[in-house]
Amino acid sequence: MAFLKKSLFLVLFLGIVSLSICEEEKREGEEEEKQEEENEELSEEELRERRALLDKLKSLGKVVGKVALGVVQNYLNPRQ
């Protein structure tokens, strides 16, 4: 009877240990997923910022081009 009792305790102990290890791995996996999601969100946010910056540069380039064109036209065809 004592042998059976020890075997049962051993099985229960090993089951609890393996269960706790699985729970720990699950928590680590969830933490890694959260970090990956945060990194993806940062990447999407950075992309939005870059697109906004490129749009501003594009607008600035158009304005500078129009000003330069006006200066060149005034130089070539001066008003008298």
UniProtKB/Swiss-Prot annotation:
The keyword Secreted applies. One of its GO terms (biological process) is defense response to bacterium. Residues 1-22 form the signal peptide. Keywords: Amphibian defense peptide, Antibiotic, Antimicrobial, Cleavage on pair of basic residues, Secreted, Signal. Residues 23-49 form a propeptide. InterPro entries: Frog_antimicrobial_propeptide (IPR004275), FSAP (IPR016322). One of its GO terms (cellular component) is extracellular region. The keyword Repressor does not apply. It is found in: Secreted. Its main location: secreted. Expressed by the skin glands. Has antibacterial activity. Belongs to the frog skin active peptide (FSAP) family. Dermaseptin subfamily. This is Raniseptin-6.
